[in-house]
Amino acid sequence: MTVDNNVLDLRKLRCPEPIMLLRKKIREIKNGTTLLILSDDPSTIREIPQYCKFMHHKLLKINTKDTIYKFWIQKTHKM
């Protein structure tokens, strides 16, 4: 896993690690910040949107057409 500013690279990780690391990263960024998440775990197609809905973050865009899934989320409240 690598983090480059507002990119969270979760490739090669499997559930539950992606959500745990996403939660940690969300705590570290400021409200209004957009985060790009990269993953190759099929469970994240379901898990990340559910996480955003539950935690009230904006899921701005999803791209699951390639083998690397991309999610753009915006932190919308303080954790």
Swiss-Prot record:
Entry keywords, A to Z: Cytoplasm, tRNA processing
A GO BP annotation: tRNA wobble position uridine thiolation
Claim: Nucleus is one of the keywords in the record: no
Pathway: tRNA modification
Main location, first listed in the record: cytoplasm
Similarity comment text for this entry: Belongs to the sulfur carrier protein TusA family.
Self-association state and partner proteins as the record states: Interacts with IscS.
Protein name, per record: Sulfur carrier protein TusA
Source species of the chain: Buchnera aphidicola subsp. Baizongia pistaciae (strain Bp)
